[in-house]
Amino acid sequence: MNLQEKTAWITHVARRVIDGDTLSFEEATALLQLPDAVTPFLLGWADVVRKCFHGNRVDLCAIVNARAGRCSEDCRFCTQAACYHTRAPVYPLLPAEGIIRRARAVRSQGIKRFSLVTSGRDPGGDFEKILGITRQLKREVPELKLCASLGIISPTEARALKEAGLDRYHHNLETAASFFPEVCTTHRYEDRVATIRAAQKVGLEVCAGGIIGLGEKPEQRVELALALRELGVTSVPVNILHPVPGTPLATQPPLPALEILRTLAVFRLLLPATTIRYAGGREHNLRDTQVLGLAGGVDALITGDYLTTAGQGTARDRQLIRDLGLEG
């Protein structure tokens, strides 16, 4: 196809999505492999789809790294794995008072969603304390929607979290099933799927996405998006690898900015009614082009700092949103 034919095809595909059709694996892969020259056109149509399904509001959330380091798993991208030598912080579960203080600060900035994140394969011996903190957060900062990211959980633990007042559970698939063994060997992709389904079964919303730029093929990003579509998750955070010394992926070449933006646009077309959330690595990898994601399908973002890397700050995020005529 020539340039004119490519833009006509993008228009046709996007209009189908707006009309309620779903894209196939082959169509999504072809979109992801479009040349840079037509990427702005693809982003424009992804933005139209976002407006049709989500309006102009950008959903903001903030996290607290409530327990850091000493993770038993070997995820090759992760600074918190005990088997790698990084300079990431290591500390036990934070006291409830500190977490409540952080939650109040988040709410004072007008952010309505707050997530408690702990390192490790699972909640372990801190689970009862986490339930208590969740109940306290619900009592003392009732305006916040509460999310938790505690690793692999059982159906019983999912139900206990729901009863304690949790609104949403976060658990990434990380990458496509076909690439997962290259990323982690200490647990299975199926363990992650089981956790997502356990959370959904008790009525928790689920936030689940992954990391791009791990060395996966473009079609494996499509595979990930289709798996998330099949699971019916509410929110899809898209992280972009920020290589850290000491991890096996420390020297992984970065994805080009336009390829990242195409990926976000394709996720929007594959998941039109789902929240697509900017997550870790956007500042490092996209730099000044990150604004194009918000004009190319993204309708949410994690604001403030991430687990072990710094964000650009809520004030700048809000300025980006305002500059685009969006609300957040």
From Swiss-Prot:
Reactions it catalyzes: (4R,5S)-dethiobiotin + (sulfur carrier)-SH + 2 reduced [2Fe-2S]-[ferredoxin] + 2 S-adenosyl-L-methionine = (sulfur carrier)-H + biotin + 2 5'-deoxyadenosine + 2 L-methionine + 2 oxidized [2Fe-2S]-[ferredoxin]
Pathway in which the depicted protein is active: Cofactor biosynthesis; biotin biosynthesis; biotin from 7,8-diaminononanoate: step 2/2
Q: Which residues form the Radical SAM core domain?
A: 53-282
Q: What Enzyme Commission number(s) does the record list for this chain?
A: 2.8.1.6
Q: Which GO terms describe its molecular function?
A: 2 iron, 2 sulfur cluster binding; 4 iron, 4 sulfur cluster binding; biotin synthase activity; iron ion binding
**Role this protein plays:** Catalyzes the conversion of dethiobiotin (DTB) to biotin by the insertion of a sulfur atom into dethiobiotin via a radical-based mechanism.
Q: Where does [4Fe-4S] cluster bind?
A: C71, C75, C78
Binding positions for [2Fe-2S] cluster per the UniProt entry: S115, C147, C207, R277
Q: Would you tell me the protein name for this molecule? A: Biotin synthase
Cofactor annotation: [4Fe-4S] cluster; [2Fe-2S] cluster
The free-text note explaining how the cofactor binds reads: Binds 1 [4Fe-4S] cluster. The cluster is coordinated with 3 cysteines and an exchangeable S-adenosyl-L-methionine. Binds 1 [2Fe-2S] cluster. The cluster is coordinated with 3 cysteines and 1 arginine.
Keywords noted in UniProt: 2Fe-2S, 4Fe-4S, Biotin biosynthesis, Iron, Iron-sulfur, Metal-binding, S-adenosyl-L-methionine, Transferase
Q: Which family does this protein fall into?
A: Belongs to the radical SAM superfamily. Biotin synthase family.
Check the record and name the Pfam families matching this protein. Answer: BATS, Radical_SAM
**What lineage does the source organism belong to?**
Bacteria, Bacillati, Bacillota, Clostridia, Thermoanaerobacterales
Provide a GO biological process annotation: biotin biosynthetic process
Q: Look up keyword Aminoacyl-tRNA synthetase and say if it applies.
A: no
Q: What InterPro entries does the entry give?
A: Aldolase_TIM, BATS_dom, Biotin_synth/BioAB, Biotin_synthase, Elp3/MiaA/NifB-like_rSAM, rSAM
Record text on subunit structure and interactions: Homodimer.
